[in-house]
Regions:
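N-terminal signal peptide c-region/cleavage motif recognized by signal peptidases
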Residues: 11-14
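Bacterial N-terminal signal peptides that target proteins for export
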Residues: 1-4
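Gly/Pro-biased beta-strand-loop elements
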Residues: 20-129
Length: 194
């Protein structure tokens, strides 16, 4: 438990919001699975081994529209049909599972039914400047995706796939940016896949 608490001290330094997640993550970490924390305020993804050891932290691209809840009516829609208001990265606790996208690329499903995943940076229209946004120090510049958590390809291959993208998956906590942190962190986990 001490290793978990020590590792979570690193999460707490990411933003003030991350401090409130320490107890739920420490409790869940006892189940032997790796876990990740998406800090939307800081636009980062932190990945931990099952024992609480920090495996890595990286900047992340997030949903274009700020918000903590999935937009009603957006579940099950084709990603390209989502409106600007539906392009959120919802807060919560999720049971993540390794999987493939429609192009056969390895991803980590956060919520399969909502087409929400962690994946590597892929080619996109030049006007979106995704690679530039990913390196920006301003977290607001990181708002561009349909809702997925997008990270540098090297980090995805080196940290995400070996931990969350193999075996039984893990837990992903997406911290709220507007709601109190414990309201979104607790409760029943949401399944990544049907």
């Amino acid at each position: 438990m001490c290793g978990i608490v020590a590792a979570l001290g690193v999460v707490a330094s990411a933003s003030a919001a991350a401090q409130g997640i320490a107890r739920p993550v420490a409790d869940d970490a006892r189940d032997g699975r790796p876990f990740a924390v998406v800090d939307k305020r800081a636009a980062t993804l932190s990945v931990y081994a099952a024992d609480g050891t920090l495996l890595g932290r990286t900047p992340a691209l997030l949903g274009l529209t700020p918000g903590d809840a999935e937009t009603p009516g957006s579940r099950g829609k084709a990603p390209e049909t989502l409106t600007v208001q539906e392009r959120t990265t919802p807060a919560g606790r999720f049971e993540a599972q390794p999987g493939l996208n429609l192009h056969g690329e390895r991803i980590v499903w956060i919520d399969y039914g909502a087409s929400l995943a962690i994946h590597r940076l892929r080619p996109a229209p030049a006007r979106e400047r995704r690679a530039e946004r990913l390196t920006s120090a301003n977290p607001q510049d990181h708002r561009i995706t349909l809702g997925c958590v997008v990270v540098d390809p090297a980090f995805f291959e080196r940290v995400v796939l070996p931990s969350l993208g193999s075996g039984v998956g893990g837990l992903v906590y997406i911290l709220p940016e507007r709601e109190p942190i414990l309201a979104s962190a607790g409760g029943t986990p949401r399944a990544a896949a049907p």
